[in-house]
A protein has these predicted regions:
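C-terminal outer-membrane/trafficking sorting elements
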Residues: 1-69
Length: 69
């Protein structure tokens, strides 16, 4: 999962199942501006649809992903 920050800010990158339950927290810390890439294997998750949510300061974005095993 790639993301870029235009300024220094607190970042939280979380993964949710289709029922809205948080299944993983990939990032939860203060980051400096720049580009980042986070690996997510999902080894402990079942095949299906998941959502990841990026909270960075006042910016929030949610995207769908498909886990296929």
């Amino acid at each position: 999962i790639k993301y870029s920050l235009s300024e220094n800010t607190s970042v939280r990158l979380s993964v949710y199942d289709v029922l809205g339950r948080e299944v993983a927290v990939l990032v939860n810390e203060f980051k400096t501006s720049g580009s980042y890439e986070v690996s997510f294997s999902g080894d402990n998750l079942s095949t299906g649809v998941y959502y990841y949510r990026l909270d960075a300061g006042t910016f929030v974005e949610t995207k769908k992903m498909l886990m296929i095993k």
